[in-house]
């Protein structure tokens, strides 16, 4: 049946996305300029933020790059922000972009080692609760020294490997190397229930690991990009940063691990799914088969990948180079010493991260609108105007948390620390209050932001990864599964800010672990970030 040219244009627009979704995006594109020019640029700015969140929430209907990109292009075209401001945002976040381009590809070339290690862990630990705690704790520990995105890239890589192994067998193609694990049409009805249970099992492990990256990432100055910016503004070194955060991070970490145990035991919010016995048998058979067929060439590859893993951890922990450049070194070393020298063999490694890199560039265009239209200014001004110091600390934590749920936590943390730094330099607040506020900003941007994928880049990467549709992990499901953690982390963090922060900081001063800061010790350079 032939189709008219007009209908062909409509059908091609956003491809297989539902018609209602296409109409919604077109409506946004019509409404935004009208609101910007005839109502109020501030309102139009917030409208754009809400619309962009909508495209993220519908990630399984349509990858957010296309609809979000159209909204961003229009925003620049009508003057909500400028190409220069977008470029400034991209330059300021070049390390994150390099990380996505190179580090995620680097992890791809270490798949064999990761599957080897994690298969042993998955088969070795029979208790789902113990396994969940192991994933959460390991992710937290690694995120304290590495980047959360790198940790999530590792976990995603492992989960895709596990999923593909079972899916191949469930589809009756156990020996096939070219099996398509994204297609369920060959899955036997008897194994379909196991497949659903297995998906739920993998979803819960991924969410535990995702929250683990937030629990660990808040603790050290290298854990998250905004931590580095905050530490730089306050003039804190690695050890001092950890100690200053302890009144909040220690109780939050303990309660986070307890939450991990509780949700698994109670089976709430999508947790509690156990590894089906049939799947365990398949993974055990796979492991035995791999062990039997492993040659010296395979062993040599595993040894090389192990040595590269050591370099990766040492390089990142000591910050020997930008994360992305260390990732590039991993690609070069892993391919050179394992014999991957064809261009098409290398291309697959970049497939996972490049669409997300493009999406992040669009995200920074939205951040540019937030800056140019001063969308957060009323909130920041209101919090800074509060006289009571204790209330100001709590409000900073809450305001940071709420804004980090809708925007990038790096951006929110940077904006706030720069505003507080300006207040310190103008004599509006004391150095002691500045130090306490810096802790409130750091914990506020890192902890409550687990509520939605917008706040944590690692969560956003997980949501838009090739793995998410395989295990049916949608935006709504992520928010629902993160809910127990969001409540516990946000409330315990708030409790720590109100009751523990001031007395414990004073105690650390008395013990001589840290010294009270002076205005001179805070670096005067406003971060190059924003």
Swiss-Prot record:
One of its GO terms (cellular component) is plasma membrane. Keywords: Antiport, Cell inner membrane, Cell membrane, Ion transport, Membrane, Sodium, Sodium transport, Transmembrane, Transmembrane helix, Transport. It catalyses: 2 Na(+)(in) + 3 H(+)(out) = 2 Na(+)(out) + 3 H(+)(in). It is a multi-pass membrane protein. InterPro entries: Na+/H+_antiporter_NhaB (IPR004671). It comes from the Bacteria. This is Na(+)/H(+) antiporter NhaB.
């Amino acid at each position: 049946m032939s189709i008219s040219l007009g209908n062909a244009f409509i059908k091609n627009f956003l491809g297989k996305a539902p018609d209602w979704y296409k109409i919604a995006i077109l409506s946004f594109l019509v409404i935004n300029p009208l609101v910007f020019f005839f109502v109020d640029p501030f309102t139009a700015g917030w409208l754009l933020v809400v619309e962009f969140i909508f495209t993220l929430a519908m990630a399984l209907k349509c990858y957010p790059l296309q609809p979000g990109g159209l909204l961003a292009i229009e925003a620049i075209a009508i003057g909500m922000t400028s190409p220069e401001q977008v470029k400034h945002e991209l330059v300021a976040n070049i390390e994150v972009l390099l990380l996505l381009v190179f580090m995620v590809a680097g992890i791809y070339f270490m798949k064999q080692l990761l599957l080897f290690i994690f298969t042993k862990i998955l088969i070795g630990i029979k208790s789902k609760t113990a396994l969940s705690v192991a994933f959460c704790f390991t992710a937290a520990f690694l995120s304290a020294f590495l980047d959360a995105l790198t940790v999530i890239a590792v976990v995603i890589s492992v989960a895709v490997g596990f999923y593909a192994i079972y899916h191949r067998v469930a589809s009756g193609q156990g020996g096939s190397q070219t099996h398509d694990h994204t297609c369920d049409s060959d899955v036997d009805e008897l194994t379909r229930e196991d497949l659903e249970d297995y998906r739920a099992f993998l979803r819960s492990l991924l969410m535990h690991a995702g929250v683990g990256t937030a629990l660990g990432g808040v603790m050290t100055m290298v854990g998250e990009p905004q931590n580095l910016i905050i530490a730089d503004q306050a003039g804190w070194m690695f050890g001092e940063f950890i100690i200053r955060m302890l009144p909040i991070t220690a109780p939050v970490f303990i309660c986070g691990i307890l939450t991990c145990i509780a949700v698994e035991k109670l089976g709430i919010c999508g947790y509690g799914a156990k590894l089906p016995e049939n799947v365990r048998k398949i993974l055990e058979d796979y492991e035995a088969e791999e062990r039997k067929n492993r040659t010296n060439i395979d062993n040599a590859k595993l040894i090389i990948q192990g040595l590269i893993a050591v370099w990766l951890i040492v390089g990142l922990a000591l910050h020997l180079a930008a994360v992305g450049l260390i990732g590039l070194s991993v690609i070069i070393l892993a391919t050179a010493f394992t014999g991957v020298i064809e261009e098409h063999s290398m291309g697959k490694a970049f497939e996972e991260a490049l669409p997300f890199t493009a999406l992040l560039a669009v995200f920074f265009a939205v951040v540019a609108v937030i800056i140019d239209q001063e969308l957060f200014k009323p909130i920041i001004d209101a919090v800074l105007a509060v006289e009571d110091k204790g209330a100001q600390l709590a409000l900073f934590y809450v305001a940071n948390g709420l804004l980090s749920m809708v925007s990038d936590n790096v951006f929110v943390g940077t904006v706030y620390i720069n505003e507080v730094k300006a207040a310190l330099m103008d004599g509006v607040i004391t150095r002691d209050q500045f130090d306490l506020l810096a802790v409130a900003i750091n914990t506020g941007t890192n902890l409550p932001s687990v509520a939605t994928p917008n706040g944590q880049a690692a969560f956003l990467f997980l949501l838009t990864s090739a793995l998410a549709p395989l295990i049916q992990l949608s935006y709504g499901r992520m928010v629902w599964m993160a809910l127990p953690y969001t409540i516990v982390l946000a409330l315990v963090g708030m409790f720590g800010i109100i009751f523990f922060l001031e007395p414990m900081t004073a105690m650390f001063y008395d013990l001589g672990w840290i010294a009270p800061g002076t205005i001179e010790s805070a670096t005067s350079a406003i971060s190059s970030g924003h």
